[in-house]
Amino acid sequence: MSGTTGERPFSDIVTSIRYWVIHSITIPMLFIAGWLFVSTGLAYDAFGTPRPDEYFTQTRQELPILQERYDINQEIQEFNQ
């Protein structure tokens, strides 16, 4: 028993002027919003990642590599000082 779902065919949607008017505005706005989200630094604040100039401090220039598997808390405290 086959039938139709009552939805518009995709070809009708893509060829309509209304579709292109709406999407010619919304798609570029998504790219602009993403660019602003990253370029203003809000992405770093929202996800808690360090900014590129905060990975290394003036006192610590080496990579924070953990060596001891079972003494991680102690090593993390040393790296954070």
UniProtKB/Swiss-Prot annotation:
Signal sequence range: none
Membrane topology summary: Single-pass membrane protein
GO molecular function terms noted in the UniProt entry: electron transfer activity; heme binding; iron ion binding
Location(s), subcellular: Cellular thylakoid membrane
Binding site for heme: 18, 23
Pfam families with a match to the protein in the record: Cytochrom_B559, Cytochrom_B559a
UniProt keyword annotations, A-Z: Electron transport, Heme, Iron, Membrane, Metal-binding, Photosynthesis, Photosystem II, Thylakoid, Transmembrane, Transmembrane helix, Transport
Keyword ATP-binding annotated: no
Chain ranges passing through the membrane: 19-40
Gene3D superfamilies hit by this protein: Photosystem II cytochrome b559, alpha subunit (1.20.5.860)
Subunit structure, as described in the record: Heterodimer of an alpha subunit and a beta subunit. PSII is composed of 1 copy each of membrane proteins PsbA, PsbB, PsbC, PsbD, PsbE, PsbF, PsbH, PsbI, PsbJ, PsbK, PsbL, PsbM, PsbT, PsbX, PsbY, PsbZ, Psb30/Ycf12, peripheral proteins PsbO, CyanoQ (PsbQ), PsbU, PsbV and a large number of cofactors. It forms dimeric complexes.
Family according to the record: Belongs to the PsbE/PsbF family.
Physiological role: This b-type cytochrome is tightly associated with the reaction center of photosystem II (PSII). PSII is a light-driven water:plastoquinone oxidoreductase that uses light energy to abstract electrons from H(2)O, generating O(2) and a proton gradient subsequently used for ATP formation. It consists of a core antenna complex that captures photons, and an electron transfer chain that converts photonic excitation into a charge separation.
HAMAP family with a match to the protein in the record: PSII_PsbE
Protein name in UniProt: Cytochrome b559 subunit alpha
Gene designation: psbE
